[in-house]
Amino acid sequence: MRFWLLLLLGSCLHAQSGENVLLVVNRNVPVSRQIADYYRPRRSVPPKNVCTIDTTGDEEIQWGVYEQQIERPIGDCLKRAGLVEKVLYIVTTMGVPLKVDGPGARDLAEHASVDSELALLYGKLKGQRYPRMGGVRNPFFMRRDSAFQHPAFPIYLVTRLAAYDLADVQAMIDRSLEARNRGKFVIDLQSEKDEPGNDWLRTAAMLLPARRVVLDETTRPLYNQTAVIGYASWGSNDDHRTQRLLHFQWLPGAIAAEFVSTSARTFRRPPDSWAPNTDWADKSRYFAGTPQGLVADLIHEGVTGASGNTYEPYLEACVRPDYLLPAYHQGRNLAESYYLSLPSLSWQSVILGDPLCALKP
């Protein structure tokens, strides 16, 4: 029985195309239109699958703006084009607002990433209602043997084409088209942390081919690795990390995940002199509100897909590398690999990359 299930799953993994993508463009931001114009022909996204919205170019917005200028128009696009079921992936572009501000903390928080909130749109179009406070359990989380399809999983998988600038986004798209299943998976623990994150990293290493894994359990962060196709670590939360950039040689299709709370808080480029750090007391070392690293640095350096967070998600809601890396290695596309590893929606996650990117043999 399991053999036939896996055979069916395998056929579904490679069946998705640009017809399953809704591309969201902000009419008021030129770079948003430029990214859409670059991406659409390369993935054969039909014209009816392009949804143009009229909203601010600010990264942070309030709930009224989100509901009236983002969620409602995107829902209208899906219904008008008859795409509610057909579309599985929503792709936002740089210039579409990034995060929604709100009060509270931990389980009472009412702030979220725009993309994570949009993941619930399918359910909302079917009449489902969700609380604004806190996260919502992701029904696709840990479903290793399940094909992602509607209505079995009543969500959209939302990814974002964003980076420091247009050139970085275009390069990321180009790399997604050249992804191949080769290279190393680099997994870097912080040995002094006795936390579940280290267990997830070790498990990820065990679930990947041993000959392709570089697992480091020392206190020394890994830099200057070559031929990297997958990476997971504590990022700038590693107390021993001193360099802003990893200086890896990333292969086309490479993905990354770091346990960093606010790495997708902005896509503004910091000064070259700035470096992430763990000193929360010294606000002179902050950039865009915190001292933590930025996921856009990974894209700039050559990563094809990466996860980050807009506000504090807490470790238990971060992307799980023990699900992400094996799923991607086994042939899942980028969007499904990340959402398979993501515990909560309507929360803080931002998934960067082309959802259709998958490792070819």
Locate predicted features.
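Cysteine-dependent hydrolase recognition
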Residues: 16-361
